[in-house]
Amino acid sequence: MTEGVPSAGSALPTPAMSSLPLAALNVRVRRRLSLFLNVRAPVAADWTVLAEAMDFEYLEIQQLEKYADPTSRLLDDWQRRPGASVGRLLELLAKLGREDVLMELGPSIEEDCQKYILKQQQEASEKPLQVDSIDSSIPRINDMAGITIRDDPLGQKPEYFDAFICYCPSDIEFVHEMIRQLEQTNYRLKLCVSDRDVLPGTCVWSIASELIEKRCRRMVVVVSDXYLQSKECDFQTKFALSLSPGAHQKRLIPIKYKPMKKEFPSILRFITVCDYTNPCTQNWFWTRLAKALSMP
């Protein structure tokens, strides 16, 4: 057995194991954790109790409830916070009385930890020697830390959004209307609007990729004639589509808010459009859009 890894089914980790990041746990273990913790039971601590023990706030837990697999999302969010580790997770499960989880998943967790330690040792042996004081290629802080108004500058608590808004500057008035209808009403959605939320000084392509892939659950595309001429909008749209081929995850939502002289973009034709130009359905427009953005 690898030194520092607890024996199968043990309730508490050894001190050495406390330093292993949560990334050591693979998908199989995480899915089985979800099977145990997603179930809401009055006699056993579920994922919401674990989230409180991880110091998640009430509103953060409410946001997690939107997801089909809240335990998986909880682990993803927690592993970005300081102090998150395999050892700490096992300590919390033991403290909450979930010995059943520890006994059932102990062997699998031990196996994952062994593989992780072995991989780290192999990478360390293959890595060329670098002198930290003269190697300018070693980043001190995540390049994508502090890219939005409410971001943590150190990257420990990044800002998340319900939707990234892809739009042209000429369509900004409609974006303002979206903010009024979706953020400042009972829907209380959180939109990522570049001109309002993104700090200047970083590559626009890198920021867009980070926000669309990792910070926003959906992307709304405001389609217009000017949109078709925008290289930035074209990049954002194609990047979002690449994350969800065939729109299986309903990640991208096109909006047509005014008549167009040019053809609707072919890459978006297979996705259901929210059409603000249709007077027969305009009364339902914001409700449908808000519901689509609120889906887990």
Swiss-Prot record:
Briefly state the protein's biological role.
Adapter protein involved in the Toll-like receptor and IL-1 receptor signaling pathway in the innate immune response. Acts via IRAK1, IRAK2, IRF7 and TRAF6, leading to NF-kappa-B activation, cytokine secretion and the inflammatory response. Increases IL-8 transcription. Involved in IL-18-mediated signaling pathway. Activates IRF1 resulting in its rapid migration into the nucleus to mediate an efficient induction of IFN-beta, NOS2/INOS, and IL12A genes.
Modification type Phosphoserine: residues? 244
- Domain text from the record? The intermediate domain (ID) is required for the phosphorylation and activation of IRAK.
- Region annotated Intermediate domain sits at 110-155
What gene is behind this protein? MYD88
Q: What's the protein here called? A: Myeloid differentiation primary response protein MyD88
Q: Which organism is it from?
A: Ovis aries
Q: Which UniProt keywords apply?
A: Cytoplasm, Immunity, Inflammatory response, Innate immunity, Nucleus, Phosphoprotein, Ubl conjugation
- Its signal peptide is none
InterPro entries, per this entry?
A: DEATH-like_dom_sf, Death_dom, MyD88_Death, Myelin_different_resp_MyD88, TIR_dom, Toll_tir_struct_dom_sf
